Amino acid sequence: MKPDRPGKVVTFGEVMMRLSPPGRLRLGQARALEVTFGGSEANVAAALAQWGVPVEHVTALPENDLGRACARFLRQFGVGLEHVVWGGGRLGLYFYERGAAHRPDTVLYDRAHSAFAALEPGGIPWADVFADAAWFHWSGISPAVSASAAETCREAVRAALAVGLTVSCDLNYRGRLWDWGRSPSEVMTELVSLCDVLIGNPGSLAAVFGLDAGEGAEGNRAVSGELARRFPALRLIAITRRGVRSASHHTWTATLWEPDGFYTAPVYEILPMVDRMGAGDAFTAGLIYGLRTFGEDRQRALEFAVAASSLKHSVWGDVNQVSVAEVEAVMKNHKGHEGHKG
């Protein structure tokens, strides 16, 4: 971790319109679709802004009514959009069908030729963006979208490092997006080597780096050690674990590694589940908030992140619309199941 410094959090990534059938209807049954907006990094920004953290999201939006509606959506949470690239292209869409019982959730993307995919290196004044920043967060979705978006992401990470920001990455592997030529392993290995904080799950670690996270907390501990050997710049590694009992009943927990400590969190039973989209982003936001707020108390930061993301499963939409007080109440109620430093 970099020395503590005041400043905003900057996030970078595509924002899309989400369209969902009401309730748990299938897309083929729907005669209307519920509309909201979301994107991994923007979801992080919106949660942090609600918790009083100064935050700016950098993205590209089409200069039309859909792009402006997307911007209004983010601004309502207090997210700064001072360096949005407005231009042509389109707003990406995704269709989310909520599952039930043994029918899993499904996602259908319609994001080709979006304004974000058309971003070109040199199009964002990163020195200006980072002038009053302390933290930069990105995810593996951004370089997956297109070759030019990947190069823009690389440019952003290097610019953040040059001015001493803490840089965090959520692997966020999306196999259907990596179709522009280079492999996710090749691109992400270079970018992750520049980061301070890495967030992932067993599936993304296997897909991107070919790593087997094994089972439970001890599996997380072992794979965290291997990641630390591969990427010596990493100072913190968080790994989430989701257990799926049915489409409506999951379990959720995480671990946190640092060079001289390993921390585990309680396991949360998520039942019933309203909406799982954005739960990983809620974890990331909770972790960033905790690391900025609780000093060296890594255990508390991890438990805050897991509690925040468990609450997200009860909130419709991509954004975790809960307060710090609500998160802390959930943490308190789970004191009988607390994690520990290993």
Regions found by a protein language model. Give the residues of each.
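Conserved N-terminal subdomain of the carbohydrate kinase-like
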Residues: 54-143, 327-334, 342
